[in-house]
Amino acid sequence: MRQALTLGADAIELDVHRSADGVLVVCHDSTVDRTTPQVGRIADLTIDELRQLDNAHWWVPGHESITDADADEYILRGRHPAEPSLGIATLEEVLREFPGVFLNFDMKDTSPEVEPYETQLADVLRSFRRTSDVIVASFHDSALKTFRSYAPEIHTSMGPAEVIEVAERLAEGSSFPEQEGSIVAIQIPFYFGDVCVVTPELVKGSHEVGIAVHVWTIDEAAEMDELLALGVDGIITDCPSVLREALLRNGSPRVTVEGS
């Protein structure tokens, strides 16, 4: 997260999970298998167990986590726990570390797969007074419904069912539906299979009703150029330095560069 900001990101997108003993942590995957030397679901491990894990164990520069590199390529391996930032961070640690950074939270799981934590997330954000400079998202419509009902003052993005409604209406030639309450953004991929999702009609329609368009996860410069030309409001990327160059190359006004 620190490196993303150093490279030019002005927001961070991250995923939230709940430990077995009820602590919210941030990690892309719902398991620790891919990044640590252990295996298991975050929901089944206590915070003490999670704190012991080396989250950089399989990391190699220029790659995501890989298991077949030469031993000397794992340049961060073994530096945790002496360097706590290489472990799995709690949500509260992230909020303390980045008080002035816009944060986008994805509630990755909910009931029945795990103990639901929608209201707990809202309570933590309220306790840090982070209700106006965050967006909460989820691929679970039920999680968003619960969160919005409990914390209507905290911004959210559209859920899957709402995105489908938008796509269907635009396909019919209808207008972008008005959004009520806490919804401030539609967060979508550029393409879904072979179908282009981010069209001029979608961008125009969303802007007409005050909804920002955020697109994930874009790492190729050519796609960044296309999206900037379409006028999207935010691009979520694993390569913020590439996006910064795209912004400079296109002479674009500043848009949100979210480091994932």
Regions found by a protein language model. Name each.
Residues 1-260:
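Phosphate-group recognition and catalysis centered on beta-loop-alpha active-site segments
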